[in-house]
Curated annotation (Swiss-Prot):
The modification Phosphoserine is found at S315. This is DUF21 domain-containing protein At1g47330. The chain crosses the membrane at residues 16-36, 71-91, 94-114, 127-147. InterPro entries: ACDP, CBS_dom_sf, CNNM, Ion_transp-like_CBS. Residues 37-70, 115-126 are cytoplasmic. It comes from the Eukaryota. Residues 358-369, 518-527 have a biased composition (Basic and acidic residues). Residues 8-191 form the CNNM transmembrane domain. Glycans are attached at N475. GO terms for cellular component: plasma membrane. Keywords: CBS domain, Glycoprotein, Membrane, Phosphoprotein, Repeat, Transmembrane, Transmembrane helix. The keyword Cytoplasm does not apply. The lineage of its organism: Eukaryota, Viridiplantae, Streptophyta, Embryophyta, Tracheophyta. Residues 502-515 have a biased composition (Polar residues).
Length: 527
């Protein structure tokens, strides 16, 4: 059967142009369908806010078009279907039927599907931005047909299909962007480790980061501050030391080591005579992020971890995203029993009253009792943030002389201590070493960092030691202590001749603790 239109005529040439236009239009619709629909709304918003300059421009042009995804999908598919259905009709006019079928399949497959989709997959953002005005015209032309269909799809499938990554997927996504993954990412090992640690910190509680109470260095309330005690504190190298009353688990407060600088060791002043601070108590089920937020308030950088004996075991609850979360009916304030927190009636008025004192009273130059004050001036709240306003924390002082020894509920068993450094180490996923730490790998006993020698003790201790004679202090060791300097320090072999005023563990920590366990060298000093 011969073709209806003779070759090489004007009509023949017009049909050829129409065929080429149909193939190009079908290919453009197929490429835009794959390229634009593969760009999620979340991805475009990320590019608009934090992409490269050119990507921001391209994403800004595409986003209004892609916003109604079902309408765009229907428009592109309708245009593609019309072009592919019309192509065989025009081919059949200029070539035999068998050749029309062959050419139609070949042209549609190669130039209408494979090539445009390959190009738009690679350069979808750029091509989509260039063709955005043309797509807007198509949306208007095909609106009467595509709009009803898109509404049906919205009703059946819902609007928008933007998918956010779950926590586990986000961690894997970050690891893939690390330079060690070999996938072209430029994130360093430290960056990926910290990001992963920040994501994992949500699922960790105080029990995961605390130091067991048996490994915590602490002092008894009636401990005399003699040479032996001061040497022990100095060799431990911590900035804060918990203080207990009779039982090591009955921790009532803490003492700042810097407050002992002026102590005369020859007078053997009892520890209860020194200025001590209250210590917060946290539940072992309290999330680390909540603990970190409490530490940032400045009341204390160390807390006692307790276990509620009356609390029944609760099974983990699996949420929709697959993450196991603990059922916890207690609020954060109930879990964090901050004994050094300001009373409610005194604390809640700080915002308005401080503003009144720092601005209103400053203008008048008068104090609360009406007396004139010299040098008073206007002070801005911005210069003194609320979280720094009570840095002195006078209400955190523990007055042993005028108040009874703090007592705590019998159903709360102290199981450990936790410091800000413990939380930061969980965030960094690395141990933090300081000048006084000696870390020994608990698996192969390889020393990593040596403890400072006894010769490096403060000169005041050395001078007192040189003036004394006839006695030798026993070997001093430390348990895992509380403070900012070394929160995960494990004990070395304790001295057999230690006074009962200084607590000492009787067993070596198991391998279930941190893989890098801190130790301290035994130090002996002649008195």
């Amino acid at each position: 059967m011969s073709s209806d239109i003779p070759c090489c005529g004007t009509t023949f040439s017009l049909y050829v142009v129409i065929i080429i236009a149909l193939v190009a239009f079908a290919g453009l619709m197929a490429g835009l369908t794959l390229g634009l629909m593969s760009l999620g709304l979340v991805d475009l918003e990320v590019l608009i806010k934090s992409g490269r300059p050119q990507d921001r421009i391209n994403a800004g042009k595409i986003f209004p078009v892609v916003k109604n995804q079902h309408l765009l999908l229907c428009t592109l598919l309708i245009g593609n279907s019309m072009a592919m259905e019309a192509l065989p009709i025009f081919l059949d006019k200029i070539v035999p039927p068998w050749l029309a079928i062959l050419l139609s399949v070949t042209l549609i497959l190669v130039f209408g599907e494979i090539m445009p989709q390959a190009v738009c997959t690679r350069y979808g953002l750029k091509v989509g931005a260039i063709m955005a005005p043309f797509v807007r015209v198509l949306l208007v032309l095909f609106f009467p047909i595509s709009y009803p269909i898109s509404k049906v799809l919205d009703w059946m499938l819902g609007k928008g299909h933007g998918v956010l990554l779950r926590r586990a997927e986000l961690k894997t996504f970050v690891n893939f962007h690390g330079n060690e993954a070999g996938k072209g990412g430029d994130l360093t090992t430290d960056e990926t480790s910290i990001i992963t640690g920040a994501l994992e910190l949500t699922e960790k509680t105080a029990k995961d980061a605390m130091t067991p109470i048996s490994n915590a260095f602490s002092l008894e309330l009636d401990t005399p501050l003699n040479l032996e005690t001061l040497n022990t504190i100095m060799s431990v190298g911590h900035s804060r030391v918990p203080v207990y009353f009779r039982n090591p688990t009955h921790i009532i407060g803490l003492i700042l080591v810097k407050n002992l600088l002026a102590v005369d060791a020859r007078k053997e002043v009892p520890l209860r005579k020194m200025s001590m601070r209250k210590i917060p108590r946290v539940s072992e089920t309290m999330p680390l992020y909540d603990i970190l937020n409490e530490f940032q308030k400045g009341h204390s950088h160390i807390a006692v971890v307790y276990k509620d004996l009356d609390e029944q075991e609760q099974s983990p609850e699996t949420s929709e995203n697959g993450i196991e979360r603990r059922k916890n009916k207690k609020t954060k304030d109930e879990l964090f029993k901050d004994s050094c927190r300001k009373p409610k009636a005194q604390f809640e008025v700080s915002e308005k009253e401080v503003f009144k004192i720092e601005t209103g009273d400053a203008k008048s130059g008068k104090s609360e009792n009406g007396e004139e004050q010299q040098g008073s001036g206007k002070t801005s709240l911005l210069a003194a943030p609320a979280k720094k306003r009570h840095r002195g924390c006078s209400f955190c002082i523990l007055d042993i002389e005028n108040t009874p020894i703090p007592d705590f509920p019998t159903n709360e068993e102290v199981v450990g201590v936790i410091t800000m450094e413990d939380v930061i180490e969980e965030l960094l996923q690395e141990e933090i070493l300081d000048e006084t730490d000696e870390y020994v790998n608990i698996h192969n006993r390889i020393r990593v960092n040596m403890h400072a020698s006894p010769e490096n003790l403060p000169s005041v201790i050395t001078s007192i030691t040189q003036s004394s004679s006839g006695s030798t202090s026993p070997n001093q060791t430390s348990h895992m202590a509380t403070p900012d300097s070394s929160p995960t320090t494990k004990p070395s072999n304790s001295s057999p001749t230690r006074k009962p005023s200084v607590s000492s563990p009787t067993r070596e920590p198991s391998d279930s603790s941190h893989s890098m366990a801190p130790k301290h060298e035994e130090s002996t000093q002649t008195l």
